[in-house]
């Protein structure tokens, strides 16, 4: 194969050109995202039912949970019961197809006998808002109609657009607002009016007419077609609907509000279709907006408030810049070591060829282009050029004594086995990653596949393209710069040889010192914090507000606007908008402020500093205020960094445990915004019927409920056609008659004989408080404790809770606990990392043992891996960074990198020993001959990492610790590889020789 590559240069060149062409096509056609496509299969089940909280929990929520738990692949079930409705979200294990999951849920829910049919919705975690549009018009009703009739349908047709949520949208309605005084005047109540309207305003199929020739369907059209007809609807003799009510075309009562720049409008949050390219979808929407604006009234304004693609492009641009700079620095290092322009240029070919061709492999395997892809390629620059350098150096040596083509063949033939060994070892590091079926596993997988693809291409480039080009263009002549600097390198080699000689004479002491270093660094690692993903400065934060009292929407709006104005006055803020009642229940006591900060170069403080400042600055005794940096992974409830659940059946016991947990978290000043969802109560007017009076006066409780429902709720009594759609006709009291308990007491009811009575004659009214919600997790009642952190790792918070778990649960066997959100993902990360590393070590040993036909040599090579981990730990400790998903990814890559140097050294020493040299002499020759290659590849890798380590641009919070871990790991492992591996080789050589005598025999011919 080597001869074929050298003898047929055009064939080889065309093959790699083809790979690069396909790579370029893939690079420009692949889906682009910030991170690997983390689509958590989530299904949301919403059930509406007339009933109080406990009834909803027992008759709906529990029934749904029991059915869901029987479905294969369910990971967690999170439910919330409210008055009159229930919401359950089931999270499936990764790999479960969302469509299959939805069908499984429908099948199971379909077997239940529920009061009403639940709504089942697919909410894959990647379907969150990609772009947000704020719509405003002075004519509010016109805005709502345009959104319903034109804007939403238009946007839904844009390619890539998935679910559209309209925050602050009010459904257009025909409002019949009753006047209680007029009702009393005519001896009527709301239920009477509702029944009369229903009996006169309807459309109904009434049968068929059939004869021998024709068939006719009989339909009765008895509904009003306009407001005037509805107003003239006769209630009783001489009394029309307009006499007892105000009738208008309006919209539903406001339960949710969206505000921007002091204006109240509607926020449209556009999600993307699962697996669709986010920037492409956003581009499609932006291109469609000018067309949309021409189709709607001019007084409707559209403002773009959120654009996810900006962050994606910002991060990718920064990583690509760091990669290009890393390539340049790497080439400078290579030239300084080789001091040969032709050799440097030939080595240079390996980098773009490997990177561009890798895109084709990644695309072929179904992956997208994301930040981790480019980081992986940046981390691999040293690997790509290292293979080429090893081959070029060997060919250059042969060129001194052989003709070019023969030198190229002998050079690659001699070093090919080492290059193959190195490539296989690197692949062994990344193959185990593919077994990680978890969210962190998707991150590891994306990087692992990218690096593994690059390694395969790099190997092909090194053994086929480089020898082919080197045989024709490599100039072995030494220039003046080479001659002037050669003495420096020879001096280093001589000093290393002298040092190595001393080490070999004191090998036991040095090995013991190395073991002490490993022990020290591992002990140091336990003092380094552990996070899932570092928070990055993306110029956006959110402020969550919750009133401690049960406020109205208007009161909550006023409080939230006061805080919004303070935030907008901050010189670091670009703009901000407010959502009140943003959750599923449209709870008016909850609000959210999205804060868009100015770009990093336009403000004085970093995002984390602003968050800390806001936590100190914005405090209100009547509000719970949380300041959060936006999470980088959406879905599965991961807004709060710290999420801890206590599970049980008794709510009072759960509250006590939650209080204890909050107290323990509060002992650490760096744990902030500590809160729980245990004490969410609402003010309530409880109506208790006096059964004796009701029996005496012959009053039906069901009748009372009907009167009150049509008086104070928003119940439909019909609909009115409006062209392509219908407006519900809603009956209730006018707002001014729904403000206090006196309005209730004045309600007129009738007994079974039709005699008018005051409601207060049979009902007692009591002010009370009741739970807003009952929260459940995996079929247990739950209380969730959430918190943020200031300069503290999530691992430290988890340890604090685990160390005090007996105190929190009070040794109560009915209580249990669970972590969710980032802490849960952190556990999955550590577990997956440990399994991947263990499997990688086993595979590396198996491969090296097979390649070297030795049980001992692989162990000598593998000692470099804990040495690298030790260096990485020291680097993180010195710079004050934590272990995180990105750092652990880097450490896995590091294990592959550092094995290269040991292989280069051991391979030569092993060959020399088999040629008859004693171990000391073999090691001195191996060390001296491989020193430059090892130093050059190490420096090349380090300088490739420097831009990532030193950059303060987008994403540095995650990129910098990763690069620092690699740099320090390379330094420690390289220094100790050059010193420890020879000592270990000598120490183990006799044992290896004895073992070989057992299993080696004269080989068959």
Where on the chain are the PLM-derived regions?
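Signature of alpha-helical transmembrane segments and their immediate interfacial
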Residues: 1-32, 413-415, 481-533, 644, ...
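Membrane-proximal extracytoplasmic
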Residues: 1-324, 369, 442, 640-643, ...
